[in-house]
A protein has these predicted regions:
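Short, compositionally biased
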Residues: 52-68, 99-113
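A short, solvent-exposed, low-complexity linear motif enriched for acidic/polar residues
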Residues: 2, 8-11, 18, 24, ...
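Loop/turn positions that initiate beta-strands
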Residues: 36, 80-83
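Short, conserved secondary-structure segments in the cores of folded domains
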Residues: 29, 71-76
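Intrinsically disordered, low-complexity linker/loop segments enriched in Gly/Pro
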Residues: 92-203
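Short, charged beta-turn/beta-strand-edge "cap" motif at the junction between a beta-strand
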Residues: 44-48, 91-96
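A generic structural signal for residues embedded in beta-strands
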Residues: 41, 85-88
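N-terminal, Lys/Arg-enriched amphipathic/low-complexity engagement segments
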Residues: 1-63
Length: 203
């Protein structure tokens, strides 16, 4: 079975042959698969391995937010053409043992509710996640791999970039293209590639 395996001791920037952290139509596929072929993909966490067990919120001061939300791939499906509908079945998902939740003032979906700084570490075992920072609570394991999507077309990139820039101009929040810590790091992908954090029409 074809696969993309992750060395969890290395950041994406140090292992760029396994993924990307920008959306762009010119990012080269890492592997090719035939329709119906199974593939094994390992994924990094949303921080690209920067949040480690035992860290405190204060340790996140040097956290590189622009390198976050790395994706594994791309995977090219042989015969697929722009505009095709792809059906992808996720046969099995396996969770890592460590997870985390962070709340930063002024950030995230609940920024208007929570104004405290907080970092919880989760241990996933026996079908539940438990955190010493939130004693007495266990959450049923609900494995979520993050984002899956298809490469945007050049036209989609331009439209989405304009839409998000307009949102920022009107006082909203969006992560605009930024070459800092982009993977792949070469141009024009680095400076024009869309950040992988927000959901869009491609995935």
């Amino acid at each position: 079975m074809k696969s993309i395996l992750i060395d969890r001791n290395r950041r994406l920037r140090d292992d760029p042959g396994t993924g990307h952290n920008r959306w762009h139509p010119d990012i080269e596929p890492i592997i090719e698969v035939a329709p119906g072929e199974d593939v094994l993909l390992e994924t990094r966490d949303a921080s690209d391995g920067q949040v480690k067990p035992g860290m405190r919120f204060e340790d996140l001061a040097g956290h590189d937010k622009k390198a976050g939300h790395p994706l594994t791939g791309p995977v090219f499906v042989k015969g697929a053409q722009p505009g095709d509908v792809l059906e992808v079945e996720f046969v099995e998902l396996t969770a890592q043992r460590h997870g985390w939740t962070v709340i930063r003032p002024g950030a995230g979906f609940l920024r208007d509710i929570f104004d405290a700084r907080f970092l919880a570490h989760w241990e996933v075992d026996g079908g539940f996640a438990r955190s010493v920072q939130i004693p007495g609570v266990r959450i049923p394991e609900g494995i979520f791999m993050g984002t899956a999507g298809v490469a945007p077309s050049p036209e989609q990139m331009l439209a989405w970039s304009a839409r998000e820039a307009d949102l920022v101009r009107r006082g909203g929040i969006a992560l605009l293209p930024d070459a800092q810590d982009a993977v792949p790091p070469h141009e024009p992908i680095a400076s024009t590639g869309l950040r992988t954090m927000p959901p869009r029409e491609n995935g």
